[in-house]
Amino acid sequence: MTMPSTVAAPLMHTARDERIKRMSKFRRAIIRPELGAICGTVAVFAFFFVLAGGTAMFTLEGAMSWSTVSAQFVVLAVGVCLLMIAGEFDLSLGSMVGFSGMIFALLTIALGLPVWLSILLALTLACALGAINGILVVRTGLPSFIVTLAFMFILRGLTIWSAISLTRQTVVSGMGEAAANDPLARLFGGKVLTGLFQWLANHGVIATFARGARAGQPVVEGIPMLIVWAIGLLIFGQWLLTRTKFGNWIFATGGDPQAARYIGVPVTRVKIIMFMFASLCAAVLGISQVVEFGSAAADRGLMKEFEAIICVVIGGALLTGGYGSVIGAALGAVIFGVVQQGLFFTNVESSLFRVFLGSILLGAVIANTYIRRLITGER
Amino acid sequence: MAVPIVEMIDIQKHFGHIIALSGVSFSVMPGECHCLLGDNGAGKSTFIKTMAGVHAPTHGEMKVNGETAHFANPRDAMSAGIATVYQDLAVIPLMSVSRNFWMGREPERGVWPFRTIDFKMADRVAMQEMSHMGINLREPEQAVGTLSGGERQTVAIARAVYFGAKVLILDEPTSALGVRQTANVLATIDQVRKKGIGVVFITHNVRHAMAVGDRFTVLNRGKTLGTADRGKISADELQNLMAGGQELAQLESSLGGTV
Ligand SMILES: Nc1ncnc2c1ncn2[C@@H]1O[C@H](COP(=O)(O)OP(=O)(O)OP(=O)(O)O)[C@@H](O)[C@H]1O
Ligand SMILES: [Mg+2]
């Protein structure tokens, strides 16, 4: 656009500044935003390896169960992470999981639309609602905490009301059969690499069912689509945030919206797009749960927004925005998933789940604050 | 007479019932350093924000190269060649020097939609431009938050100069600086000016203004007290004007080009 130009140095310094300490490669490599989450992940795996090493938790079947649960958290956490780095919250995401799933089911069952069309409509609606959230926040200047809290109630209420008024129930079933042969539904449910797993089973690498209807089939048929979504979103989010121009704008928008605006970053557009993206992530989770379970329930996604925020904060993001890591958030989600499933395998009282989680949250956040100060020079 | 790069005619700015600017006229010629002086709350920052597209003026006209211009946002002003280094909001502390340097104009490579920032080039240029300004960085990824206040200003100035602004607005760039860095900034202003760029230099410090200024405009309570050319006004006279213009009558003769 403009011609770069160089101004000769008024006071040229060629020598190294003697006041700058050299940082070792190792130190530079480990001092990163995800460090707290990496340590947390290692600690959690070590903990369960000691407690539940002999149980089914560390078999392929067990691993698939905690991976699937973690993947649910990852899908939501990626959206929440980018939104939080852009400086905003969305407390309506849990309700959005339930709402988008319910809309998808109602359009298919009650209105008889083809499954693929219902999915597209549900995703579009989620995007539109995300945009409304975003526009309300940037136009009114109200904290997103309040605006999206309102939407948390509104969407949950609409979910229950629409289900009851159209079907007289809060659980809409029959989605399994409806989605069975739909081309788009296949992206949201079922498994991939089934051939590979069958091949591995035939060669004795993974166990097979010995008896019953599925005798000879592998105990793990393939990788659930939700895990594919989680990995895809994770890679996309990390790439977007750290490698692209838009990612630079996301950081700037959350770091200092006024300064970003002055230097020409379209702050409102960035925020609105991030609200839409987070809603889209919630809708992906909502729709894939419906395809997976064969039904939509009005209470799906309850409290999920808070759990996602916890994952993101464990992952090193700053609650006030401008700093964070998608990889960190995904590790936070894995910690969450492993702890939740691990306590099930170890038969520990499930109430301890909360105690454990609270402790990890506290530990990770304290570690993160310390690491962040090292990196950013916050005083 | 040459056409000013930017000319502001009778600019007013009201915030609700607060009148921050009540009719300010001002111009910047290519290659001059026009100092804008005034006490706290005089309206200096508000005035340059209308120039930079942050605020739309309530009343008044703005001309760029002799043609009427309207800026809807800071981007418009930037593409018209008006670059601004703000008093307090110059850079984003949590982000790296290199990312701050390129903010809003990131160099990209690759094919759409897989375009990414060209970090190699971005880092190299940022390091080089910073060292031209006398600041040695440990690495381009170093966060701006680890720099001192003056060094942060320098990042913003280096950025504006690098992107070839036609008008460079500096809002109190020296107020947070030490002796050496102030000398650096003043020397930079001088060099920028020699390249034909118009500089608007806001300061409280009359000595800094006298060191580089070609023209001096004093704002007081949202009004201009007048514009004086270099050599037609002394430091003491400027100081008095800034202090409230009690001795205005006495000074009127020296303010040749009163608007
Ligand atoms: N967004 C705003 N809303 C309301 N009033 C404002 C706004 N911005 C500035 N003002 C008022 O306009 C007046 C001029 O402020 P301005 O920031 O331009 O002063 P200044 O000359 O830059 O002062 P300083 O030397 O302290 O930086 C002040 O009285 C201020 O309160
Ligand atoms: Mg000011």
Regions found by a protein language model. Name each.
Chain B
Residues 2-259:
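Glycine-rich phosphate-binding loops of nucleotide-dependent enzymes
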